[in-house]
A protein has these predicted regions:
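Glycine-rich, basic loop-to-helix element that forms the pyrophosphate-binding segment
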Residues: 75-91
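Short aromatic/hydrophobic "clamp" motif used to bind/position activated sugar donors
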Residues: 96
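Conserved donor NDP-sugar-binding/catalytic core segment of glycosyltransferases
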Residues: 108-156
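Active-site donor/metal-binding and catalytic loop motifs
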Residues: 204-217, 230-256
Length: 346
């Protein structure tokens, strides 16, 4: 076995690791500036160096001035999902680390992510990002009441569990001790995966509906849950900590920030529920349960958001956007385009 050596801080011990065949794929608009530089510094300082770094930009966007000096730059049609997939054409490594342009991590980060895959226990891994969970008490209560997102009660051995409403439950944990937490969803900002598994997911099949509304809301949930549905396993490595510095280079206007995401929330919930939960359910009784769950989500979401619109100044546009998104989602799942989508399983 080929090994390389990394001295410990005390210089008295030497730890040996197997060489990891991996490449890095970065999705960027080339505008993250200092935050992108932090990512490049993290890559330079990584204990395990990648075989290749592929940087994917949308057509018409310039290369960032911050560079490693050996990366491959690729341009593709502007697409949040498409930019992820474009890098695969240039990668032959066994594993790929997919990154957004505003991530930073410690030198041993790759080693921690690769471990569960090399042990043949999982096919995809990433670190915990608790900042993506509801931060406020009001948000937590609203998520529970509408079956959108809640703290896990029955799946505390997992990081995220997808609910029959199309929502999800989550579990926070101690990050000081290494442990693998199975998960059915994770933030798409950073993940380490077997390259062939990523190809096998056929994520290009999901682009027609994920990017139908300018804003690829829920692409992370779709990718992770499709991975699970196709028989693969994903985990969170509790000690694989990283920083998401959120450059927010994709939110270009007030209209997109305030209106499009709420619309996409309603649209996504309906389509995701129908495609990944209802259509994939073989038991008729559970289909009835699923229908009750999404019905509850729609009624409770309407009631909660209506009350918030009455009590909160300026919330009516968001309320209307969510309701329009739900209506559009219901219409879409009966469209020819949707009915022609390939099945999520093989």
């Amino acid at each position: 076995m080929v090994v390389y050596e990394v001295p410990q801080k005390n210089r008295q011990k030497v730890v040996k690791y197997a060489v990891i065949s991996y490449s890095i794929a970065i999705r960027t608009l080339g505008r993250a500036g200092a935050k992108y530089q932090k990512l490049l510094d993290s890559i330079r300082n990584s204990t395990v160096q990648p075989e290749k770094v592929v940087v994917v930009l949308p057509e018409g966007y310039s290369k960032p001035k911050e560079q490693l000096g050996y990366e491959v730059f690729v341009h593709c049609r502007k697409s949040m999902v498409g930019q992820r997939l474009a890098a695969l054409k240039y990668i032959k490594s066994e594993y790929t680390l997919f990154l957004d342009d505003d991530i930073s991590f410690e030198p041993d980060f790759i080693l921690k992510l690769a471990k569960p895959l090399q042990e043949k226990k999982y096919d995809c891994s990433t670190g915990p990002l608790f900042s993506f969970f509801p931060a406020s008490k009001a948000g937590t209560i609203a998520g529970i009441l509408t079956a959108s997102v809640s703290v896990s009660l029955f799946h505390r051995d997992m990081y995220v569990k997808i609910l029959r409403s199309g929502g999800w439950s989550y579990h926070t944990f101690d990050t000081s001790e290494e442990r693998y937490y199975p998960t059915e969803s994770f933030a798409w900002t950073c993940f380490f995966i077997r390259t062939q598994v990523m190809r096998n997911l056929n994520m290009e099949d999901e682009i027609p509906w994920l990017e139908k509304n300018q804003y690829a809301f829920g692409d992370d949930r779709v990718m992770a849950y499709k991975l699970v549905k196709r028989g693969y396993r994903a985990c969170i490595v509790s000690t694989a900590l990283y920083e998401h510095n959120d450059a927010k280079t994709s939110t270009a206007s007030t209209e997109i920030v305030n209106t499009t995401p709420p619309y996409c929330t309603g649209f996504f919930q309906i389509v995701f529920w129908h495609r990944f939960i209802q259509d994939d359910e073989p038991l008729k009784f559970m289909k009835v349960v699923n229908s009750f769950c999404i019905g509850y989500w729609m009624v409770s979401s309407f009631a909660y958001r209506l009350l918030k619109a009455v009590l909160t100044r300026g919330y009516w546009p968001i309320f209307n956007a969510v309701m329009r998104g739900i209506k559009a989602g219901i219409k879409y799942i009966h469209s020819d385009e949707y009915l022609q989508l390939p099945p999520i399983r093989y």
